[in-house]
């Protein structure tokens, strides 16, 4: 029924629109409006479902795009927060590493100084011992030299002051002293 009414209106509209003999401007305007309404009606009738389907699909696509954009924004926010947190953790770890490195370096420096002092003390002690040994050796050599010189001097004195008769008397006295 709708089709018949629309077809009739179309034919009527076209026939009246084609008639221009005695038409005034208001009638022309009226029939142009009728033709436009008929055209829009036909477009709606034959293409309404497709247009509606297209617009609904487009609306759904736009809504999906908005949802995806919101999800991507949330994901980006989470990633940004994670990156900030990791940056803070990295800064903290860096500060801790620097602190530990400084403490370790200080301990190593103190340990090295302590070892150097111990080595210096050992070297001093060894030097003192070496000096004492050398002093004792020198004293022993001096004593030996002094004894040898004293013996030489004694021999020369005895040889010069003792003659054979004095020597015999001295031997006899020594033997008597040993017998007693």
Swiss-Prot record:
InterPro entries: ATP_synth_b/b'su_bac/chlpt (IPR002146). The keyword Lyase does not apply. The chain crosses the membrane at residues 26-48. Keywords: ATP synthesis, Cell inner membrane, Cell membrane, CF(0), Hydrogen ion transport, Ion transport, Membrane, Transmembrane, Transmembrane helix, Transport. It is found in: Cell inner membrane. The keyword Cytoplasm does not apply. CDD domains: ATP-synt_Fo_b. Its main location: membrane. GO terms for cellular component: plasma membrane; proton-transporting ATP synthase complex. It is a single-pass membrane protein. GO terms for molecular function: proton-transporting ATP synthase activity, rotational mechanism. It comes from the Bacteria. Pfam families: ATP-synt_B. Belongs to the ATPase B chain family. PANTHER family: ATP SYNTHASE SUBUNIT B, CHLOROPLASTIC (PTHR34264:SF3). F-type ATPases have 2 components, F(1) - the catalytic core - and F(0) - the membrane proton channel. F(1) has five subunits: alpha(3), beta(3), gamma(1), delta(1), epsilon(1). F(0) has three main subunits: a(1), b(2) and c(10-14). The alpha and beta chains form an alternating ring which encloses part of the gamma chain. F(1) is attached to F(0) by a central stalk formed by the gamma and epsilon chains, while a peripheral stalk is formed by the delta and b chains. F(1)F(0) ATP synthase produces ATP from ADP in the presence of a proton or sodium gradient. F-type ATPases consist of two structural domains, F(1) containing the extramembraneous catalytic core and F(0) containing the membrane proton channel, linked together by a central stalk and a peripheral stalk. During catalysis, ATP synthesis in the catalytic domain of F(1) is coupled via a rotary mechanism of the central stalk subunits to proton translocation. This is ATP synthase subunit b. The lineage of its organism: Bacteria, Pseudomonadati, Aquificota, Aquificia, Aquificales.
């Amino acid at each position: 029924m709708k089709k018949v009414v629309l077809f009739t209106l179309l034919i009527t509209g076209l026939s009246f629109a084609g008639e221009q003999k005695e038409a005034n401007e208001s009638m022309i305007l009226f029939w142009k409006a009728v033709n436009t309404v008929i055209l829009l009606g036909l477009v709606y009738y034959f293409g309404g479902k497709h247009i509606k389907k297209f617009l609904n699909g487009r609306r759904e696509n736009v809504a999906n795009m908005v949802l995806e954009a919101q999800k991507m924004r949330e994901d980006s926010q989470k990633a940004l927060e994670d990156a900030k947190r990791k940056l803070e953790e990295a800064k903290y770890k860096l500060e801790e590493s620097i602190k530990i490195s400084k403490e370790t370096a200080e301990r190593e420096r103190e340990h090295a100084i302590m070892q150097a002092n111990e080595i210096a003390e050992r070297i001093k002690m060894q030097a003192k011992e070496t000096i004492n040994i050398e002093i004792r050796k020198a004293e022993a050599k001096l004593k030996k030299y002094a004894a040898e010189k004293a013996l030489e001097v004694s021999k020369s004195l005895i040889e010069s002051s003792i003659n054979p008769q004095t020597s015999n008397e001295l031997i006899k006295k020594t033997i008597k002293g040993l017998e007693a």
